[in-house]
Amino acid sequence: MRASKNSLSPTIQMRSSGFTLIELMVTIAVLAIIVGIAAPSISTQLANQRVKATANTLANALKEAKVESVIRRQEVAMTYRSSSTPNAIIAQDANDVVLFTYPIHQKSSVTINPSTAGTVTFRPNKIITSDKDVVYTVCDSGSSNETPKQVRINKVANISIINSGSC
């Protein structure tokens, strides 16, 4: 004989009807603990990705300006503007004509050393006009645990990215 659901006693029907409130609360509590542990590391990872993306954007913009100065056979100046919205790095030719603009993420903070080198000028002979190396240090204003990166330009216009610096 087959037993149908309707022929079962009411106490058995209630027992097999689903999750209890306690089981649901325990599941939610465990989930909250897991999310609480994972959330800080995710925010640090996102900050590191923003720093990496900004450093790569700066390096690519500088490399493009270096190539443009050789192709055009004139100086090309790169200026980082933190006062504009969004922050940007702008390339201009010798006649102050804007060649290209790269936006920088708003949560990224960039400091330049030496501070007087707000503009880096590339010459057609593949050197920069500055007598000193120029270093852009990239940090993230939304996090204090990120790994800062530096974009370095030496006198002969070699551009490199390193994991260094302090925020």
Residue ranges and their predicted role:
Residues 1-19, 160:
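N-terminal leader/signal peptides at the extreme start of proteins
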Residues 145-147:
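Short, small/polar residue-rich loop motifs at catalytic or cofactor-binding pockets
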Residues 131-142:
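Right-handed beta-helix
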Residues 71, 82-84, 142:
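A generic beta-sheet turn/junction motif
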